[in-house]
């Protein structure tokens, strides 16, 4: 896996929009699509993830690795392309994700965890930790929002990648309750695919900055045993 990220290509940035126009049909995953995935999308996401995993492993007390999702499944191409930085020997479906996602119209990056069967242990630990550290969690989220990193509402599979920030639960005024209601934690920054920075190798630094801004929250909600 290359540690050299040279920026996203036009083929990569345009690919999800094309698939969206084709309604992600099985027929749209033809030989040309497979070649774009193999030669552009997959290696570019992989290289960006590996740069980020290496960098934040050096900057923090954690050891990270990259983990990329497939671009297709039995139903056809996936509604977005994504991968994540996860604990060494971890998995994107069971651990907190420091993720990168190419979703129609946007590149998104941030911290994600879902209340799912596979991630149940990580989810329960994260929510309980939030409840015990509500003020610290609120401080991190408030600070991150200054540079455009915000908690967002869940999206349906076919929705565009437009980030829709969420507000804290008005009754409890607690972020833990907000995320419990959403059944996921999704705190992110997004760039429109037309943004020139996406085509620049320095975009890796943008992603690393997002991950490091969220690292105080990661420390609060991650179970240290997953790094043992």
List each model region and its residues.
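Amphipathic, interaction-prone secondary-structure segments
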Residues: 64-97
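Solvent-exposed, non-transmembrane amphipathic alpha-helical segments
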Residues: 49, 57, 61, 120, ...
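Glycine-rich, compositionally biased intrinsically disordered regions
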Residues: 44-77
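Long, solvent-exposed, polar/charged low-complexity segments
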Residues: 1-31, 35, 39-56, 154-228
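Functionally constrained cores in energy, signaling, and assembly domains
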Residues: 16, 67, 134
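Intrinsically disordered, low-complexity regulatory segments enriched in Ser/Thr/Pro
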Residues: 89-131, 180-197
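Compact, glycine/acidic-enriched structural inserts
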Residues: 105-170
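A generic structural signal for short, non-catalytic loop/turn and secondary-structure boundary residues
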Residues: 57, 61, 76-78, 93, ...
């Amino acid at each position: 896996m290359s540690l050299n990220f040279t920026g996203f290509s036009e083929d990569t940035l345009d690919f999800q929009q094309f698939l969206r126009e084709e309604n992600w049909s099985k027929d749209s995953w033809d030989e040309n699509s497979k070649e774009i995935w193999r030669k552009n999308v997959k290696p570019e996401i992989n290289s960006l993830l590996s740069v980020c995993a290496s960098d934040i492993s050096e900057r923090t007390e954690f050891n990270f690795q990259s983990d990329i999702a497939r671009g297709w499944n039995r139903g056809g191409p996936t509604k977005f392309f994504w991968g994540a930085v996860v604990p060494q020997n971890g998995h994107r479906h069971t651990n907190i994700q420091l993720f990168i996602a190419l979703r129609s119209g946007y590149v998104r990056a941030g911290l994600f965890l879902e209340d799912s069967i596979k991630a149940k242990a990580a989810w329960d630990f994260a929510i309980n930790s939030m409840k015990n550290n509500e003020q610290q969690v609120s401080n991190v989220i408030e600070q991150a929002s200054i540079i455009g990193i915000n908690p967002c509402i869940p999206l349906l599979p076919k929705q565009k990648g437009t980030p829709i920030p969420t507000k804290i639960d008005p009754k409890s005024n607690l972020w833990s309750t907000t995320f419990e209601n959403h059944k996921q934690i999704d705190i992110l920054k997004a760039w429109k695919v037309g943004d020139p920075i996406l085509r620049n190798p320095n975009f890796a630094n943008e992603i690393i900055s997002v991950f490091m801004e969220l690292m105080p929250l990661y420390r609060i909600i991650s179970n240290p045993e997953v790094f043992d």
